[in-house]
């Protein structure tokens, strides 16, 4: 039975859904949507929990995605949701509040006051950016301040650019941004934390270094002006865009609460099949420390979905094998039929 994409009915307090789903996907970014599409096309019953806008929602366009280069993130998500319509995928706008493993091995996920049960759980909850506490920076995140030159560098190529940060990550990002423009300034905000070798690297390719504390960011696309970086005790700097590599944290506490192991960078640890340290629980996308590109997240979602579908196929075969060897009272072997199909 093919079901259109639909929201769940209003919950009744404390109700446990009787149906056992194949998969619950927590998170509807590119990774979760891609997994839902592949599982839906594999005739699996899926519940996709949305839970909010994608991390790239503030930017005006997503780039680097074949046939969709320059598409607005909201339009990209709307199209992905529409693509799920022919399949048995139910989309809920609410996120998961709680997850637990049941005594029978199934996973229970609380949405509002309702619990939904599934054989497999897939997290695609992403990460949250922790932005520096520079006045004016947060308001311009995605609108004059960016994290990925591969996503937003071309639109500013050849113009005056700045990289905010210090240490190894800023050194790497400044050298990368230099490929788009020969007018790059590194903003160390009072703490350069650069080794002499890193400083030589930057100066060798013409990256200027400003060590003064940054006071404020003004202007930018929000005001149809260049970004004006003001400093304490030094002249301001006008640039077309600022790039930075922010610290990040998990987008949801649920994987860790369920016992999924995190690596030393705080990312959910997965194997080559996207499975976490908890059997039957998978994780995909930015939350695993994979390269943070839309196409990479979508590919990981598709890969995990194929692994999950294969696992479910094998589990059904093994279940039928065990049923076949059950004997009735007369001692004759009998093969139990598979569960009836919804179609």
Stretch-by-stretch model annotation:
Residues 36-37, 171-174, 284-338:
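A conserved FAD-binding loop/helix module that cradles the flavin
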Residues 15, 21-78, 159-160, 165, ...:
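Beta1-alpha1 glycine-rich phosphate/pyrophosphate-binding loop at the start
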Residues 2-23, 91-159, 268-272, 276:
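FAD-binding core/adjacent interface of flavoenzyme oxidoreductases
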Residues 3-8, 78, 84-110, 116-118, ...:
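A Rossmann-like FAD-binding core segment of flavoenzymes
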Residues 133, 139-155, 246-295, 303-306, ...:
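FAD-site-proximal beta/loop scaffold in flavoenzymes
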């Amino acid at each position: 039975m093919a079901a259109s994409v639909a929201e769940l009915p209003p919950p009744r307090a404390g109700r446990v859904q009787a149906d056992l789903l194949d998969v619950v996907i927590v998170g509807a970014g590119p990774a979760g949507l891609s997994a839902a599409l592949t599982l839906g096309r594999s005739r699996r019953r899926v519940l996709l929990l949305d839970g909010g806008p994608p991390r790239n929602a503030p930017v005006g366009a997503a780039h680097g995605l074949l046939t969709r280069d320059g598409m607005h993130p909201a339009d990209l998500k709307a199209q992905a949701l529409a693509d799920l319509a022919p399949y048995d995928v139910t989309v809920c706008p609410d996120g998961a509040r709680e997850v637990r493993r049941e005594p029978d091995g199934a996973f229970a996920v609380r949405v509002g006051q309702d619990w939904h049960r599934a054989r497999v759980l897939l997290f695609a909850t992403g990460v949250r950016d922790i932005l520096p506490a520079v006045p004016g920076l947060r308001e311009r995140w995605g609108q004059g301040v960016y994290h990925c030159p591969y996503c937003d560098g071309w639109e500013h190529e050849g113009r005056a650019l700045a990289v905010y940060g210090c240490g190894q990550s800023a050194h790497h990002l400044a050298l990368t941004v230099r490929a788009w423009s020969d007018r790059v300034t590194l903003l160390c905000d009072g703490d350069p934390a650069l080794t002499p070798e890193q400083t030589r690297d930057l100066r060798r390719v013409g990256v200027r270094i400003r060590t003064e504390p940054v006071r404020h960011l003004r202007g930018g696309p929000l005001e149809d002006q260049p970004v004006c970086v003001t400093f304490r005790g030094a002249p301001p700097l006008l640039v077309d865009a600022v790039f930075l590599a922010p610290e990040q944290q998990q987008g949801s506490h649920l994987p860790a609460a369920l016992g999924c192991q995190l690596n030393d960078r705080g990312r959910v640890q997965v194997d080559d099949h996207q499975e976490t340290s908890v059997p039957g629980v998978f994780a995909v996308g930015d939350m695993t420390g994979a390269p943070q590109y839309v196409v990479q997240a979508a590919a990981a979602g598709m890969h995990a979905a194929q692994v999950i579908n294969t696992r479910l196929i094998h589990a059904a075969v093994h279940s039928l094998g065990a049923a076949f060897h059950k004997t009735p009272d007369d001692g004759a072997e009998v093969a139990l039929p598979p569960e009836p199909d919804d179609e």
